């Protein structure tokens, strides 16, 4: 028998279960493999004397602990559980360790220092010591080491006052105790040691307690990063303290209070309480359990009992869990990406920083193998460029681990050249370059010297010879190719002479050479650019893009070759003729920007050549340069306006609180915080932040930081979020943040807006106050505070890593972009300025949101009022902008108007802004132009008439067509704006006069007030009349114009008396309007507005109307409006409603419409008193009004050239002929809403037929009369006839509508013999007048024309035959189409486009699935994908036995043939034997050579189902669905995402679910239900016994006889049942479906010829695979639906298909 040596390491491995249990009791876990590695390698390499075989010596253990507990990156937190367990075995040894403990050593006497020596205090690895200023003192220890230090429950805690006894006289051997063994050695003097010891069992098994010292707590806090900065490091420190010291509840609180802030401590405790386990081990929500396990107040735990220590151990574990939970930060991969390798940083150091970033900013552990891929990618792409490029080029990079990459990176790093080597290399390269250049220069100088020496001789030799010719791209100076001499960089240049042209917009240096003359400076996109005028250039050229480039390119041919250059996008160019949009060529190689012929044409430039050179002028001969001056006078442009600045400085000094420049951000102290009310149904909206360009982000970042510093913004966490949009300020590079609050505005309650209307705001400004002060409040909305409950509504995302911001910000003040902000601020400012208005009643203060206008009668009053206003604003917390202030001036700009001497003008800036608008190119730009110009319509006479051609282009859905008319209107508006006059301010103390004129449906007027003997214009008014009023006679149109303009003028007059002056005496017309033209509602409205005697007066008619600006004829055109309206007739002057005495015909008309059998039927009739003149049915759905119109129109048409009296009982038809017809015609057959009137075609036909009779009288008679009068008899007969006609067959539509409006004459139709045969069958009658055959009121169309019509109709619509039939029946064609249904079917079936696109309509009967004859013989297999994949498992391989339905499912990480073969050989074959048949789809894993080879070797018949036909694998596909659905339900129930763990439960369910025959797969296989234990049954003795083997075999035999054999017979019976096959046979032409179609690609391809067929699939030519019958459709009609023009079956030229004896061959033949 051999003997083995037992070491401490082998001893622990032999008792490993006890070692692991001891570690678990201490709250840690240890691993056996790592235990061996640490003992044999890691701790040995620490060089502290640790032996390879291990030791239980406390000295060695303490030395290892110092290394492991070292602070910062030098420690080893992962090794703390292992060394702690070693110490536990040494200090509290079990029985199998005691024989191996080292003998106790006598303590070495401590030497006494002769004199106090100053020494720097040293800190331990875990418990650093504070330096002390007191003299060294010996440690306070009890005299007897065996005596207890402290009784935890009876004695007071330390420190204790102790004396300084003499040192021990000699060594003595003390009795070792656990406390003494735990005293750690210090590297400093013993007098300066600070001990912090854990709670341990001392003598007599009493717990001894030493609290933490102040120095330990201080050093832990000062030598470790705070929790917010590095939570991982601090958590590891606290974990080591909890493990090694085992502190009490009070010590834990003291430790948390010292190392964490209040907020962090609260978060840790909250996270810890969430992890308190319940009875089932899961986190509980019971408050009593939580308070008992993790109390917030000091508990009454007795640490001398096991229960108390167990409470404390669980408390420490929960505290660690809380620390880790609170340490989790939101994932911020952007912070990880910012960790890049430094220039001189080693790859190892960089990797450590990268891992630390992963721990700090992500919840992922970089040491986790699952995260290795992301860490590797970050390590590669964030390395320095040289290392990154070489790592990316490594072969087989996907197989490298992180350690492999680190080694490669270290190799690359070590091979780097040093800075000295790099400098040496660059110096050598520069030296070689200089040598080469010097050599070339030497050759050049030698050549020059030689040429100068022999100049005369060479000239004589050369004679008349020319110089050496240069290349087309060769420089004549340096002889290099690629440029010309004028662009040669080596050519010396003369200093440019001083230019007399100053380019104010040049953004380059002051000494830059301008382009040569002639040159012009234009503004491109707001930036000035100086161009060289080049008439030879077809297009203008820019050398700098200054914006995005388009994808359009142009080939530029130059002297040195040709090259493609890109165009810029459309830029706005300011020309002398206005602003246009233009696209430039971007040619960076061009020396100067070129002004080509394209822009010169738009500029209308003129070039004059004089003795001084070329001169470029504008269209009127004026120079195009704006400013020319000498350079020595340039300084005058920058001289400050000293007077105005000094005055402003005085105001800033006297009122510092009123200005934003001196008072800072204001706050309205008198206003309560604004509370926003949400709608009742509002829910939070969260919209992600849009991607923001870097330039824009940098532009708004200073503004965000400024508002954060001012407290306008603050960080928050809100369920609301809206995006932030950076908007670039025009003409600058600055951006301002604008928040998109549209979604928030939708969810906020609307309030009534009380903001003043700028249209009439200045009406309250009296002309008697000519001194003005204008103040613009700065950041006005930010002066109002926002309630804390409403602040979260306006949150937005913002990230600023430089200041540590990553999250949401929100506004603490009223934000801009909120829909109610203007109203809320306007009301708040009004209330704050109410006291000012009361104190200064003589002043006029106008307020438009944040724009204030103060008007006074004198300058003194204006100064005093301005001072008081500034003081009020400053006291209330508002701030005005000193930059925009206009103080005590007689001419100011307010709301875009210039105010002076009681008048207002349009500002020059506003005119220039409108004049610079380029020609619109879409509807949106037209609306923008009309909106901008419409703001100035008060200054433009007849603006509505000028802009009339532009308004139709603004309607949605209208095709944008910019023509000459629109261009003229566009230019006329700009011209009218240039000549806009000055308008007087409305004086509400004086009466107003309104001159009105109307022309072609446009109302124009001038509102004036008297100024001495003159009439001063106040406003020019214009508007277009509505559609109804536009159709009235001129006098009534004038009434409508007066009503519209009086309403608009009321906004300016504010209810003051108004006198109306027109050229029509309309007052009598208003008082007695005609009933024929006006409705009662409109008549009442006009009278209520215009007959207000207190406000509206009608003046005398005038002959000079300022509205038209044209003199009227002398004396005017005086007329009586009532008389003119009375003389206004309808379309026919002699039309009357009285019977004609000499009438040739007296007829009665009527139309009937009613619903019968769910369908509306209609008819019309014309009769006399006793006989029917005409009657016809009308199309289904015809209304009664339409029928009346048709009947009356037919009567007028038949009475052509005769005197007719016609009676109708329709008010609608009677009013149309006498009144409304003329009104409809005048207004363009439009309703008052601008829509087309109903029955438009019938009304037009009726108005045209009114002129056919010689004389006409249309009389209205009551309907359904009783009596014997002629009118009653005729009306009853017409009514009965119309009803009778409606009940006749109405499949043939009436021809009246098309006959009433005759189109162009067509040539007569020619009927062939087949058409005449059809005519005879239909018994149609011939119409000799038109030369056509008529059938049921319809004209029979020849068949060839009918087929052509249907063919063209199908080509236009590509509708189906049924749809086209419905379309033809609904339309009133008036034609009978012979064989319509046949032609419709033929055309649709022969359309190739429809065949390639339309879906097939092949229906099949129920299929029969082939199954196995017994279990295990026939399987189906398939892969299914399940996301999200857990632990790399993303696929599930499913096998199903087709006989029993038994399923097997295996998780897989990859969908490969290797997985299929592995599971087939290792799982299916050992359990169920070799399958006979295996079915699957055409997936790559199944058609792979590996899978097929395995099946061939095992003798398995592997059947591949049809492609793109999941039904072929229906059984396994249905099982996939069942498994997925059950997994989804279980994950919802359990809350677990690990579907692999839940898979056994799913398989149990599907194996015990009854199938079609009521049996479960388990019962089919085993003959009984699965065994189940009733856990709630007290008697379980019945489950303890099991049947014998013979009983099992007998049961299986019964299963085979009673279940499996009948089941196989049932399957066989289904297979033998005949199935109706598909209708395709060999030789047919079919279309084949494309399963993956591209955009606008046909759905079907072909046609193909069928070669072979099976009951379910086909083989066609040109396609290798078999195709399922559901994936094809017939390419032409079947045999029973052959086209009439197709060749017959006996056609000798037709191919025939015959079968042969060989089933794989067919015979094709054709007769000759």
UniProtKB/Swiss-Prot annotation:
EC number: 3.4.23.-, 2.7.7.49, 2.7.7.7, 3.1.26.4
Motif placement: PPXY motif: 157-160
Region (Disordered): 97-208, 416-440, 487-518, 1262-1289, 1676-1703
Annotated motif LYPX(n)L motif, positions: 126-130
Comp. bias (Basic and acidic residues): 416-434, 1276-1287
All copies of domain RNase H type-1, residue ranges: 1141-1287
Residue sites binding Mg(2+) 2 per the record: 1150, 1188, 1209, 1279
Low complexity: compositionally biased ranges: 120-132
Residues annotated as domain Peptidase A2: 529-599
Zn-finger (CCHC-type) residues: 473-490
Protein name: Gag-Pol polyprotein
Zinc finger map (HHCC-type): 1354-1394
Site (Cleavage): 127-128, 197-198, 445-446, 502-503, 627-628, 1297-1298
Span(s) of short sequence motif PTAP/PSAP motif: 107-110
Organism (species): Feline leukemia virus
PROSITE patterns per record: ASP_PROT_RETROV (PS50175), ASP_PROTEASE (PS00141), INTEGRASE (PS50994), RNASE_H_1 (PS50879), RT_POL (PS50878), ZF_CCHC (PS50158)
